[in-house]
């Protein structure tokens, strides 16, 4: 049954004609393949991993799963404006186990009212349902407006499902909930202004994380806010700093949360493919103190068919939660520890399907952590993914940043 449209964002979207907005913050995937219609220009983009996921050690697990993503954009001129309708979708609620995909040291969201530890939750069916407007102004400036029943507020770097440097990784970053977990938020309104190399954006949105039902929308008050400053000193270089204040974001944690992020991204197309990298760090301000997550990731496609990629991360975790696999009670003193992660992978494009770009790949990951965690994680776990990746669209479903 389709979700009911109600609340403040429904009023905005149903009462206003749509246009091409500066998307969730500074970046929206521009779908690749397109077809011309009398008024609207339609474009689409998508990818799907089919992978065998083996997480090592006593806290590990195994699964056969599919991480996937699709986006549809309809664009048309509307007077002085450009108008777009944006839809982003995933069928991960059907292709990933309800309790999430095995991923050592991951933390965030819930299943059955219990905090997910060593699991990456599935993304919602509706990742974005939004309208967007852009308008050029004098002296090389432009205005962007964005409104979505679900979308991405102006905080963080490009979310990992959409950025080129992460396009071949079959797993989420461990720092996801420090950097870009707001990429699926309910009831988002964003305004942005660009002058030369500078873009300033501000958002209002509903701060609570989506609930455990991954098939619906979760509407609420515009109770949270975000802002971002982005610089593009070179076509390939993007620098952003951002912050947001979220009202009661976590189902199991009382209180509001402040997040601050900064990142430097590089993306360059080449004759044989691309080179892309991201250095990012984010901090969640919690009652027990700051919680940091940082990463450096890169991907290089060369000779058209070959991709090598890697990611280095450091994230803060709570010892009690990692040992007991549940939310730390307020009566237990927090014990923070740093976890370092390393992921390396390779993919090869193969001529399997005419309708899609297909690659076969593998990735390995290992972590360095506190000795106190060895009884529950082993001495040095080594996790492995082996996968097929299908990309749809004229660029093979490869994400990219604007």
Name each model-derived stretch.
Residues 79-84, 139-143, 193, 197-201, ...:
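Repeated loop/turn-to-beta-strand initiation elements of outer-membrane beta-barrel proteins
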Residues 26-136, 381-391:
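Beta-barrel outer-membrane channel/assembly domains of diderm bacteria
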Residues 97-230:
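Surface-exposed coil loops of outer-membrane beta-barrel proteins
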Residues 344, 378-402:
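Outer-membrane beta-barrel "beta-signal"
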Residues 242-252, 275-288, 293-299, 305-353, ...:
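Outer membrane beta-barrel transmembrane domains
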Residues 46, 70-76, 129-135, 189-195, ...:
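Residues on the lipid-exposed face of transmembrane beta-strands in outer-membrane beta-barrel proteins
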Residues 40, 62-70, 123-129, 183-189, ...:
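Residues that define the transmembrane beta-barrel architecture of outer-membrane proteins
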Residues 48-56, 89-95, 147-153, 195-197, ...:
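Transmembrane beta-strands of outer-membrane beta-barrel pores
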């Amino acid at each position: 049954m389709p979700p009911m449209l109600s609340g403040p964002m429904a009023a905005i979207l149903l009462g206003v004609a749509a246009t091409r907005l500066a998307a969730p913050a500074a970046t929206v995937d521009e779908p690749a393949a397109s077809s011309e219609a009398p008024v609207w220009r339609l474009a689409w983009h998508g990818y799907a991993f089919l992978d065998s996921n083996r997480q090592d050690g006593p806290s590990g697990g195994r699964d056969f799963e599919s991480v996937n993503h699709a986006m549809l954009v309809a664009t048309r001129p509307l007077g002085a404006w450009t108008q777009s309708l944006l839809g982003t979708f995933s069928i991960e609620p059907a292709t990933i186990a309800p309790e999430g995909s095995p991923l050592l040291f991951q933390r965030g969201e819930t299943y059955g009212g219990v905090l997910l530890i060593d699991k990456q939750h599935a993304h919602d069916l509706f990742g974005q349902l939004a309208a967007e407007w852009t308008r050029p102004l004098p002296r090389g400036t432009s205005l962007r407006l964005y409104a979505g029943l679900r979308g991405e507020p102006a905080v963080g770097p490009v979310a990992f499902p959409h950025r080129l440097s992460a396009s071949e990784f079959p797993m989420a970053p461990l720092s996801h909930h420090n950097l870009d977990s707001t990429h699926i938020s309910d009831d988002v309104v964003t305004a942005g202004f660009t002058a030369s190399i500078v873009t300033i954006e501000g958002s209002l949105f509903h701060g609570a994380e989506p609930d455990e039902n991954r098939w619906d929308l979760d509407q609420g008050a515009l109770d949270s806010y975000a802002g971002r400053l982005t610089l593009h000193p070179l076509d390939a270089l993007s620098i952003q700093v951002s912050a947001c204040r979220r009202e009661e974001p976590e189902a199991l944690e009382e209180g509001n949360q402040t997040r601050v992020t900064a990142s430097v991204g590089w993306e360059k197309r080449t004759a044989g493919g691309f080179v892309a990298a991201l250095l990012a760090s984010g901090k969640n301000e919690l009652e027990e103190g700051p919680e940091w997550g940082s990463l450096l990731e890169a991907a290089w496609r060369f000779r058209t068919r070959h991709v090598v990629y890697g990611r280095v991360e450091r994230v803060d975790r709570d010892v009690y939660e990692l040992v007991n696999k549940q939310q730390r009670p307020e009566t237990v003193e927090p014990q923070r520890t740093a976890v370092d992660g390393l992921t390396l992978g390779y993919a090869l494009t193969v001529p399997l399907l005419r309708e899609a770009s297909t690659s076969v790949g593998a990735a390995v990951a290992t972590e360095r952590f506190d000795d106190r965690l060895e009884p529950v994680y082993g001495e040095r776990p080594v996790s492995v993914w082996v996968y097929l990746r299908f990309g749809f669209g004229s660029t093979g479903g490869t994400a990219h940043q604007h």
